[in-house]
Amino acid sequence: MLAHEIRARVARGEVSPLEVAQAYLKRVQELDPGLGAFLSLNERLLEEAEAVDPGLPLAGLVVAVKDNIATRGLRTTAGSRLLENFVPPYEATAVARLKALGALVLGKTNLDEFGMGSSTEHSAFFPTKNPFDPDRVPGGSSGGSAAALAADLAPLALGSDTGGSVRQPAAFCGVYGLKPTYGRVSRFGLIAYASSLDQIGPMARSVRDLALLMDAVAGPDPLDATSLDLPPRFQEALEGPLPPLRLGVVREALAGNSPGVERALEEALKVFRELGLSVREVSWPSLPQALAAYYILAPAEASSNLARYDGTLYGRRAEGEEVEGMMEATRALFGLEVKRRVLVGTFVLSSGYYEAYYGRAQAFRRRLKAEAQALFREVDLLLLPTTPHPAFPFGARRDPLAMYREDLYTVGANLTGLPALSFPAGFEGHLPVGLQLLAPWGEDERLLRAALAFEEATARAHLKAPLGEAL
């Protein structure tokens, strides 16, 4: 059952918030041991469900929260041994807003350590399996949230997107994932990876559920100086006819895709034309180089952000006879991929190489953004694949560069700050395929309106993996 359908049933008195919480908790306990979507569950869930006011706008809805988003009183690990027992004394703004409207945190979902990865294989605890094929990855780094949705272990989820970490797992698991305009959702309480790129993003199994979630979490926040004063009107934007829109298909993303992705793109273009959109091919010339710039800028910011984990203030502290030895031993607890990115980031920020790498990457970022702004003077939306192929098998991307190439089509939205939405667009065999829409800065609602029209024309909502009995 979809989130807006659950909410309607609660409002009519057909089911109570407690009954909803009990049903999802039972399903998680039955199915998640074989899936690994959750790192921890909210032990007070049923108590909180019994106490919630059923008249609140989101009463009856439980939310799976990625485990790099702070939840007061509930363990928040960022998928790292370094924060294995960290219980935040504060709440992320996005979580606080959900709770104020009656939603409940079901549990914390698995991720690549500190959000650094594209498969959830880099979690310090265990990998998450793709509900459509247990031998394949769910994507990352928000793989636990995507898998929980696809298996119907939760009706709504929060992830975070630094270079595609909401959209890529959404594509691999056949769900919706939105990377909002940078600043549209407060980052307060999100454990930082790369602060100029990070963004909390909603995930769901229908566009209406995505709009419900965005209306709850978006909006300005005095605790985040980068948050935007843009009132959310997502559910309102879904009403009425689809306006005439100009759709640009990004030429640089048309080659090298798998047959299923190519077929999904062709079918989507046919649907959008039938919906009245004018379609043309456009060029975003710098997009193929965006990946190289991203893997300079993101590690550079990570090396600064992760310097705080020295064992002196919070997190796990390794033993050492002196402070320096203790700090070295503590940081040795970082996983291999985190160490790799911190080393890269430290190198590109070093005095001898700063301008050659970091300075040039920042200049490229400005050029990429200028090109995108020019494109949106010609079209209203951009369309490209979310990933070049469906989910890959575990262990298939052992070469770090091969794993980094998974972000080829997604990093552009992060570097430019633009909103981007991955939506289910078909299958390659038994594996879901996702496509991606981008809109101009601040026009997140436009993405959802176009995706809803596609969803209604193709019956893509309610897609879930065939696991267990349906709720």
From Swiss-Prot:
Assembly mode: Heterotrimer of A, B and C subunits.
Cited function: Allows the formation of correctly charged Gln-tRNA(Gln) through the transamidation of misacylated Glu-tRNA(Gln) in organisms which lack glutaminyl-tRNA synthetase. The reaction takes place in the presence of glutamine and ATP through an activated gamma-phospho-Glu-tRNA(Gln).
InterPro entries per the UniProt record, alphabetical: Amidase, Amidase_CS, Amidase_dom, AS_sf, GatA
GO BP, sorted A to Z: translation
Catalytic reaction list: L-glutamyl-tRNA(Gln) + L-glutamine + ATP + H2O = L-glutaminyl-tRNA(Gln) + L-glutamate + ADP + phosphate + H(+)
A Gene Ontology term for the protein's cellular component: glutamyl-tRNA(Gln) amidotransferase complex
Keywords: ATP-binding, Ligase, Nucleotide-binding, Protein biosynthesis
Domain of life: Bacteria
Active site location: 66 (charge relay system), 141 (charge relay system), 165 (acyl-ester intermediate)
Broadest EC class assigned to this enzyme: ligase
Pfam families: Amidase (PF01425)
Protein EC: 6.3.5.7
Protein name, UniProt field: Glutamyl-tRNA(Gln) amidotransferase subunit A
PROSITE patterns per record: AMIDASES
Listed GO MF terms: ATP binding; glutaminyl-tRNA synthase (glutamine-hydrolyzing) activity
Family the UniProt entry places it in: Belongs to the amidase family. GatA subfamily.
